[in-house]
Design a protein with these regions (language model features):
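Long, low-complexity intrinsically disordered regions
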Residues: 1-259
């Protein structure tokens, strides 16, 4: 893909796209390169394979930042705790799942005290940058680094918060601006009349559609709520909404294409 418009169309077509790849989802970077991508070396130098590539006259990094800030696409970590672009076509489904985990009783069960405080602070502020969030919560000391960033990742993995890199940072400062799911998606989300179990089933189908072919034993590692998804998966197989062959599951779209 050579233009930003093509990349945006690709994300909307797949609904879920991995930012860097290395998992079952189609990859943003592989789509840009036109071939599967793995870093050629460890550390920062491994990213140089693609970091300098230009798309529509802009660097891949700049295009990625533009895309995650769009009104119809966001980037979170709901899939395998890795950076994932999510089309607004999927937001009504994810919204039902996020709302389930926003329930006070559920939140207290799944989140630590620090995660609850971070979420409350982001809810109160509406939008807040990482450094200011740390200052507000008095977590600026170095010994809090790991715990703080791990907590942010966990909240992203549940879809409860969404971050975008600050487009106008101060010199040498790279930091996300955080919002709750509700704030980030409120303008264009739409509302689906789905139960929690129905939303889980639809998300699983969409994920397998995007991935085409997956190992069944990997599904429990996909989402933070994977323990709730087993019954939905079994029913989808019975209904023919997803297909099974040995240890693999694949999209029913494959059958439709071949029929």
């Amino acid at each position: 893909m050579k233009t930003q418009a093509e990349i945006i169309e690709f994300i909307h077509d797949k609904s879920l796209v991995s930012a860097l790849g290395g998992n079952e989802l189609p990859s943003f970077i592989s789509a840009v390169l036109g071939k599967p991508w793995k870093p050629s070396s460890r550390g920062f130098t491994g990213w140089m394979d693609w970091w300098s590539i230009k798309i529509s006259g802009q660097s891949v990094a700049h295009v990625s930042q533009d895309i995650e800030g769009r009104e119809d696409i966001l980037a979170d970590r709901i899939f395998r705790r890795t950076r994932t672009f999510v089309s607004n076509k999927l937001w009504p489904i994810v919204d039902t799942i996020v709302r389930h985990h926003q329930d006070p009783a559920v939140k207290r069960e799944i989140l630590s005290d620090i995660e609850l405080k971070i979420l409350e602070a982001i809810e109160t502020e509406g939008s807040i940058r990482t450094d200011r969030l740390r200052k507000k919560l008095k977590l600026e000391a170095k010994e809090n680094n790991s715990r703080f960033h791990r907590s942010l990742t966990n909240l992203e993995s549940y879809g409860l918060i969404v971050g975008i890199e600050d487009p106008h940072p101060e010199k040498h400062l790279h930091a996300n601006i955080w919002q709750t799911w509700e704030t980030r998606t409120q303008e264009t989300r739409g509302r689906a009349s789905l139960s929690y179990s129905e939303a889980l089933a639809k998300l699983l189908v969409k994920t397998i559609d995007a991935s085409v072919l997956v190992r069944e034993d990997q599904i429990p590692r996909w989402f933070k709520w994977s323990s709730d998804i087993q019954a939905a998966k079994d029913q989808l197989i019975l209904d023919g909404a997803i297909l099974k062959s040995g240890q693999y599951l694949f999209s029913s779209n494959v059958r439709d294409v071949n029929s």
